[in-house]
């Protein structure tokens, strides 16, 4: 094998289709575009979503919902997540370091999902009534 003998595998390369270059090429005259109509003409393509003047689907359907501007700054943490943490005291910094909440989060709330079997002190976080009861039942407390 020499460098001058190297070539691509058979069938791996295809010649570019040259259209509109005479009748003998097999792709002359209309160049594969058919006869007449918008798509046969130069520049004859409509924009995405255009339905020929009919009211397009994206405008027929009503607008719904909104984007919350506070979503990035508030987070929820489950009892299951807290159970997995090694820390005896849990605050926002501990949650950020563990990757349970994002870096932008300013406040977090503990929700009752999963079980808590060990004593944990929650500092500076909100908690639902169910989560509060579960934390206190496990011997933990919620500090302000």
Curated annotation (Swiss-Prot):
Residues 21-31 have a biased composition (Gly residues). GO terms for biological process: translation. This is Large ribosomal subunit protein uL15. Residues 1-48 are annotated as: Disordered. The keyword RNA-binding applies. SUPFAM superfamilies: Ribosomal proteins L15p and L18e. One of its GO terms (molecular function) is rRNA binding. NCBIfam families: rplO_bact (TIGR01071). Keywords: Ribonucleoprotein, Ribosomal protein, RNA-binding, rRNA-binding. Part of the 50S ribosomal subunit. It comes from the Bacteria. Belongs to the universal ribosomal protein uL15 family. It comes from Cupriavidus necator (strain ATCC 17699 / DSM 428 / KCTC 22496 / NCIMB 10442 / H16 / Stanier 337). The gene is rplO. Binds to the 23S rRNA. GO terms for cellular component: cytosolic large ribosomal subunit.
């Amino acid at each position: 094998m020499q460098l001058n003998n190297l070539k691509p595998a058979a069938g791996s390369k295809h010649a570019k289709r040259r259209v509109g270059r005479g009748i003998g090429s097999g792709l002359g005259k209309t160049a594969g575009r058919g006869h007449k109509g918008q798509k046969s003409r130069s520049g004859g393509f409509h924009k995405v979503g255009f339905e020929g003047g009919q009211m397009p689907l994206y405008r027929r359907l009503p607008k719904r919902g909104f984007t919350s501007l506070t979503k990035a700054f508030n987070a929820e943490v489950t009892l299951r997540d807290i159970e997995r943490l090694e820390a005896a005291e849990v605050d926002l910094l501990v949650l950020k370091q563990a990757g349970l909440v994002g870096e932008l989060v300013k406040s977090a709330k503990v929700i009752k999902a999963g079980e808590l079997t060990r004593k944990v002190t929650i500092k500076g976080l909100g908690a639902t009534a169910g989560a509060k009861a579960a934390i206190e039942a496990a011997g933990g407390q919620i500090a302000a």
